[in-house]
Swiss-Prot record:
Assembly mode: Homotrimer.
Pathway: Glycolipid biosynthesis; lipid IV(A) biosynthesis; lipid IV(A) from (3R)-3-hydroxytetradecanoyl-[acyl-carrier-protein] and UDP-N-acetyl-alpha-D-glucosamine: step 1/6
GO-annotated biological processes: lipid A biosynthetic process
Enzyme class: transferase
GO cellular component annotations of the record: cytoplasm; membrane
Location relative to the cell: Cytoplasm
Protein name according to UniProt: Acyl-[acyl-carrier-protein]--UDP-N-acetylglucosamine O-acyltransferase
Gene3D superfamilies recorded: Hexapeptide repeat proteins, Udp N-acetylglucosamine O-acyltransferase, C-terminal domain
Length: 262
């Protein structure tokens, strides 16, 4: 079903069964599959392919040669009807690829709201992106990677399968991330190592001086105190009882499965 206010260029192909919302713009030579739903106000510039069981929200901008919902690159995939879900107000630039999930990984690749995926970024099967993340040019997320909110992944950086990247993390360009990165941390290198707290990012997002100081103290306990992780955890948990801004560290430790970058 195509809403009467939507525009579909004469050279575009929209397969029967697709649901195209109000004021959607589908540009030249785009292909939209039968099991695709595109929300109100979303724009497909040109030569965009949206395939599979894919749901795209409102007011997204998707640029030339982006491929969304295509068959993933997991050799175990056997054609199951797995999905991609994309939220609202995302900017998906040229040649970005976002692959459908796998049964083994829960069947869903999910992108939240207000993200920027720059040219040639790759989001593999079963990845989850929060809100307001940035993937710079040629950044690559392997399967099952999870990014919390406000994460920045630098250009040419690769993130290993199943890694978790905490909120407000910034990973520098040309890095290789092989383990989980706790929230608020700046990481760089191959293999990526911690380089301090993302202070400028926290200031821009309205964190108070007191909150940033508490986060830095938690970081010091984790990385500069000489304590093991098991020794640092209870002290960070105690700090979180006095400063709620530290609680994301505690929550992250409970989720981490690959160990932390050191």
């Amino acid at each position: 079903m195509i809403d009467k206010t939507a525009f579909v260029h004469p050279t575009a192909i929209v397969e029967e069964g697709a649901v195209i919302g109000a004021n959607v713009h589908i540009g030249p030579f785009c292909i939209v599959g039968a099991n695709v739903e595109i929300g109100e106000g979303t724009v497909l510039k040109s030569h965009v392919v949206v395939n599979g069981h894919t749901k795209i929200g409102r007011d997204n901008e998707i640029y030339q040669f982006a491929s969304i919902g295509e068959v993933n690159q997991d050799l175990k995939y056997a054609g199951e009807p797995t999905r991609v879900e994309i939220g609202d107000r995302n900017r998906i630039r040229e040649s970005v690829t976002i692959h459908r999930g796998t049964v083994q990984g829960g069947g869903l690749t999910k992108v939240g709201n207000d993200n920027l995926l720059m040219i040639n970024a790759h989001v593999a099967h079963d990845c989850t992106l929060g809100d307001r993340c940035i993937l710079a040019n040629n950044a690559t997320l392997a399967g099952h990677v999870s990014l919390d909110d406000f994460v920045i992944i630098g250009g040419m950086t690769a993130v290993h399968q199943f890694c978790i990247i905490g909120a407000h993390v910034m990973v520098g360009g040309c890095s290789g991330v092989a383990q989980d990165v706790p929230p608020f941390v700046i990481a760089q290198g191959n293999h990526a190592t911690p380089f301090g707290v993302n202070i400028e990012g926290l200031k821009r997002r309205g964190f108070s001086r007191e909150a940033i100081t508490a986060i830095r103290n938690a970081y010091k306990l984790l990385y500069r105190s000489g304590k093991t992780l098991d020794e640092a955890k209870p002290e960070i948990a105690e700090l979180a009882t006095q400063h709620p801004e530290v609680q994301p560290f505690v929550d992250f430790f409970a989720r981490s499965t690959r160990g932390l970058i050191r």
